[in-house]
Amino acid sequence: MPKFIEGKLDAKGLRFGIVVGRFNSFISERLLEGALDALIRHGADDKNIDVARVPGAFEIPLATKKMAATGRYDAIICLGAVIRGATPHFDYVAAEVSKGVAHVSLDSGVPVAFGVLTTDTIEQAVERAGTKAGNKGFDSAVTAIETANLFKGIK
């Protein structure tokens, strides 16, 4: 019979970094509230949570890389909102942020949860920041907890 390794949803004793973009703060602050709520509900001590605020989504990967390099965090949660406008700027930012965050996780071995919304409209972002479609900040924190525990089981 194979051995199954799964992460549990218990944040006790784990240390988390959160990187949140300030641009579109009316959305990103709701995502941050959701992430903090999930971490605390699942047993994290608020003294084991560090929040780094960066100007916008484009700065998220580099701040995440700096946090990962410290070796202090069991997982890092990236939060922000990139909303499509009338120019191709959205496409460049959304693609580079997602690639950059993925590279940090792969290169560092630290679990990184991607909670950066990439939406076509403000309404879609609002729906995903605590209204009709739930709170993706909360969901990202749950992913971070589970993955951090999974990695502890693999060691």
Curated annotation (Swiss-Prot):
Q: Which GO terms describe its biological process?
A: riboflavin biosynthetic process
Binding site residues for (2S)-2-hydroxy-3-oxobutyl phosphate: A86, T87, R128
Annotated coiled-coil positions are: none
- Give the E.C. number(s): 2.5.1.78
Where does this protein hold 5-amino-6-(D-ribitylamino)uracil?
A: F23, A57, F58, E59, A81, V82, I83, F114
Q: Does the keyword Transferase feature in the UniProt annotation? A: yes
Where's the active site on this chain? H89 (proton donor)
Would you tell me the Gene Ontology cellular component terms? Answer: cytosol; riboflavin synthase complex
The pathway that the record names for this protein is: Cofactor biosynthesis; riboflavin biosynthesis; riboflavin from 2-hydroxy-3-oxobutyl phosphate and 5-amino-6-(D-ribitylamino)uracil: step 1/2
Which is an annotated GO molecular function term of this record?
Answer: 6,7-dimethyl-8-ribityllumazine synthase activity
Q: Which reaction does it catalyse?
A: (2S)-2-hydroxy-3-oxobutyl phosphate + 5-amino-6-(D-ribitylamino)uracil = 6,7-dimethyl-8-(1-D-ribityl)lumazine + phosphate + 2 H2O + H(+)
Q: Which UniProt keywords apply?
A: Riboflavin biosynthesis, Transferase
| PANTHER family reported for this sequence | 6,7-DIMETHYL-8-RIBITYLLUMAZINE SYNTHASE, 6,7-DIMETHYL-8-RIBITYLLUMAZINE SYNTHASE DMRL SYNTHASE LUMAZINE SYNTHASE
Give the record's family classification.
Belongs to the DMRL synthase family.
Summary of the function given for this chain in its UniProt record: Catalyzes the formation of 6,7-dimethyl-8-ribityllumazine by condensation of 5-amino-6-(D-ribitylamino)uracil with 3,4-dihydroxy-2-butanone 4-phosphate. This is the penultimate step in the biosynthesis of riboflavin.
Q: What is the name of the protein in this document?
A: 6,7-dimethyl-8-ribityllumazine synthase
Q: Which organism is it from?
A: Geotalea uraniireducens (strain Rf4)
